[in-house]
């Protein structure tokens, strides 16, 4: 077990991959975003990740991304770090987004691997280095091959770890062996980006998690990490088991995490081509959530977002 004091966690342990609230007409709702962010911080989140996969970033404009960041910064102040998602198939646009995020008040950048064109690893490395050199912000590299079509290979991460502003990885690669090797060989802070792997990755030395489930169950996730850090691994495993039914429905049911999180929160529509969860899926999510509250203690849920 990795002692808490030996973990490198530049953005905190438990980060929420925050949804992006929209109004009933589909417009960005910065006020609702601010309320949700403040509730997440009150319920134990150490940091917030905006404009990521759960935040429907492919459907928001550059201006909306900046407005969301400013609204959340105004709501939470300097209490927690805010990491802004950037990235795409165009290095120039990614750099523009990174500089915009820095101006809007981000504390770090979540930089997704360049998707669609599927460049070779040498080009992937160059892409990340160019973004890292473009601002003064620390980078969390986002390895999510199911969405991008390419891995950020462990060997590439080992080389990038030498860059002074490459400090962390959001790991959605489902490669526990590869992740463990990089954790052991570098000072990169690993964050689980797949809720079902939060505890396994934490057990092998990860810094924490960037969680979709944290939108609705932040206190339970905080309790899991606290139990593990206190040496009570049995309690951490128990909480993890209790979270599993909800985690499965939210992240592995075939519905995107943002759809399921918004269904539970009543957080407004998703943007097309995504579609809202149906009645049956929503009812199942609510049953799993109520069961979680019953078995873990009725923690206050995040403030509903109109």
Model-identified regions with their sequence ranges:
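Active-site beta->alpha loop and helix N-cap motifs at the rims of alpha/beta catalytic domains
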Residues: 2-149, 159, 299
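Flexible, active-site-adjacent loop/turn segments at secondary-structure boundaries
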Residues: 9, 13, 17-20, 114, ...
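A general structural signal for well-ordered alpha-helical segments in protein cores
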Residues: 33, 65, 69, 94, ...
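Catalytic alpha/beta core domains of metabolic enzymes, predominantly
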Residues: 133-134, 145-247, 251
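Glycine-rich phosphate-binding "P-loop"
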Residues: 143, 165, 271, 275
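Structured C-terminal cap/extension of enzyme domains
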Residues: 202-306
């Amino acid at each position: 077990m990795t002692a808490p004091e030996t973990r490198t966690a530049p953005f905190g342990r438990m980060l929420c991959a925050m949804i992006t609230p929209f109004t009933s007409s589909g417009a960005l709702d910065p006020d609702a975003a601010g309320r949700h962010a403040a509730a997440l911080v009150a319920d134990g989140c150490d940091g917030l990740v905006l404009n990521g996969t759960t935040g429907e970033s492919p459907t928001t404009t550059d201006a909306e991304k900046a407005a969301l960041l400013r609204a959340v910064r105004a709501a939470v102040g300097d209490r927690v770090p805010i990491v802004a998602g950037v990235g795409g198939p165009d290095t120039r646009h990614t750099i523009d987004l990174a500089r915009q995020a820095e101006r809007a008040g981000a504390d770090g950048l979540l930089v997704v691997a360049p998707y669609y064109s599927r460049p070779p690893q040498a080009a992937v490395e160059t892409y990340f280095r160019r973004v890292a050199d473009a601002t003064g912000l620390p980078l969390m590299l986002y390895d999510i091959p199911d969405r991008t079509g390419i891995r950020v290979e462990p060997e590439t991460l080992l080389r990038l770890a030498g860059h002074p502003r490459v400090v962390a990885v959001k790991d959605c690669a489902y490669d526990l062996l590869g992740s463990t090797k990089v954790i052991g060989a570098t000072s990169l802070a690993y964050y689980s980006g797949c809720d079902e792997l939060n505890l396994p990755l934490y057990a092998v030395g990860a810094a924490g998690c960037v969680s979709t489930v944290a939108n609705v169950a932040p206190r339970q996730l905080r309790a899991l990490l606290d139990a593990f850090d206190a040496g009570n691994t049995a309690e951490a495993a128990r909480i993890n088991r209790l979270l599993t039914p909800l985690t499965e429905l939210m992240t592995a049911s075939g519905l995107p995490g943002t759809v399921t999180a918004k269904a539970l929160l009543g957080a407004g529509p998703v943007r097309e081509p995504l579609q809202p969860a149906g009645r049956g899926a929503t009812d199942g999510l609510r049953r799993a959530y109520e069961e979680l509250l019953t078995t873990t203690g009725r923690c206050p849920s995040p403030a509903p977002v109109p």
